[in-house]
Amino acid sequence: MDKSLEEKLMEQGKKAKAASRFLATASTTLKNEALLKTADALEAQGAEIVAANAIDLELGEKQGLTPALLERLALNESRIKDMAQGLREIAALPDPVGEVLGMWRRPNGLEVGRIRTPIGVIGIIYESRPNVTADAAGLCLKAGNAILLRGGEEALNSNRIIARIIAQSAKDCGIPEGAVQLVDSEDRQAAVYMMKMNDYLDVLIPRGGKGLKQAVLEHASVPVIMTGMGNCHVYVDALADLSKAQKIVFNAKVQRPSVCNAAETLLVNAKIAGDFLPAMIAELKGAGVEIRGCERSREIVPDILPAREEDWDEEYLDLILAVKVLDSVEDAIEHINCHGTGHSEAIISEDYSSVRRFISAVDAAAVYANASTRFTDGNVFGFGAEMGISTQKLHARGPMGLQELTTTKFIIYGDGQIR
């Protein structure tokens, strides 16, 4: 069984490699045509997608998936329309391929330039959210890359139909069928095989939790861009506008707790903790949030659960919030750089020096002053849909849009020069 699965993946890799050569020189018009055709097809076949998704949801409930995972798994007419609209927005974005990043003339007469080119074949391993299938495929096609998709087994039925629609729409426009392929297997070994497909994958992008990250660190020999995990913090400074802070904290935790840019820990300066925490915690608890606090926070609000040491490192993806009282912005920076995942961090303060210190010292892809962490998103930043939020420093950091799915090459024009 394992051998046949590995052989199937290698065959898919060969098809993807061949398709990537076609896509590298495909016109913007052709790529946009495929994206728009896919968007129309997703909407036209929405009922079939919802039916397939219902099977996944039923199986997920039987298997005991958490409410947070089921929420991420669910598709409905509105979310399918959002997927289609996302593809139309990608089609409307400028094509990064061929963009001239610089051109200069050397003393020997050589004209040296640098341009954007596709990466080639991109593999993505992701969990739960079937809308990622459409977003990732759309971005890769627009950036001239072939893509090999390995979604979570809990979303297999949903991913099958979405990937089939995308591949067929692209094929109808003249793009090789190997451009968009789904790894159609529930066997988790498929992900491990992908991590070693050096001959076919130019980069692997895993989107998932601690387990997936650990597996990638153990097994991957292909280049990897880590994305996803968001142990995000909001620090309320001694000179914060408390009304503003309360709105931001509530939004960062409650608006959509199952996503990676939701806040997981609230840090509060001791000077304002007594004034801020009682009302803040009451509002959060009223929205169903479970509060786990340090000893100092429990002295102020006794009826909250005690925080364990592991709570400071937890990405809950649920209506749970850890709370810690600290003495200074420096303590907040130290806590975040020790326990954060490099995703999104926020300070609420009217003090310019504290804001500047926080922004400069916190090691994260996105650092906010007086705004919710929930804004870390490709669409919000103006990139269109995103491949994920990179939490590493090479090759990309933060929301990965079209430009982050390209590389560069040098072009040199001469007139007979030799060295």
From Swiss-Prot:
Pfam families to which the protein is assigned, alphabetical: Aldedh
Could you tell me what this protein does?
Catalyzes the NADPH-dependent reduction of L-glutamate 5-phosphate into L-glutamate 5-semialdehyde and phosphate. The product spontaneously undergoes cyclization to form 1-pyrroline-5-carboxylate.
Which EC class is this protein assigned? oxidoreductase
* Keywords in alphabetical order: Amino-acid biosynthesis, Cytoplasm, NADP, Oxidoreductase, Proline biosynthesis
Q: Which organism is it from?
A: Syntrophomonas wolfei subsp. wolfei (strain DSM 2245B / Goettingen)
InterPro entries to which the protein is assigned, alphabetical: Ald_DH/histidinol_DH (IPR016161), Ald_DH_C (IPR016163), Ald_DH_N (IPR016162), Aldehyde_DH_dom (IPR015590), Glu-5-SA_DH (IPR012134), GPR_dom (IPR000965)
Where this protein primarily resides, as one coarse class? cytoplasm
Q: Which domain of life is it from?
A: Bacteria
GO MF annotation terms? glutamate-5-semialdehyde dehydrogenase activity; NADP binding
State the family it belongs to: Belongs to the gamma-glutamyl phosphate reductase family.
Q: What is its EC number?
A: 1.2.1.41
Name listed for the protein in its UniProt record = Gamma-glutamyl phosphate reductase
Give the catalytic activity: L-glutamate 5-semialdehyde + phosphate + NADP(+) = L-glutamyl 5-phosphate + NADPH + H(+)
Please list the GO biological process terms of this entry: L-proline biosynthetic process
Keyword Magnesium applies: no
Q: Which compartments is it annotated to reside in?
A: Cytoplasm
Q: Which GO terms describe its cellular component?
A: cytoplasm
Residue spans making up a coiled coil are: none
The pathway where this protein functions is: Amino-acid biosynthesis; L-proline biosynthesis; L-glutamate 5-semialdehyde from L-glutamate: step 2/2
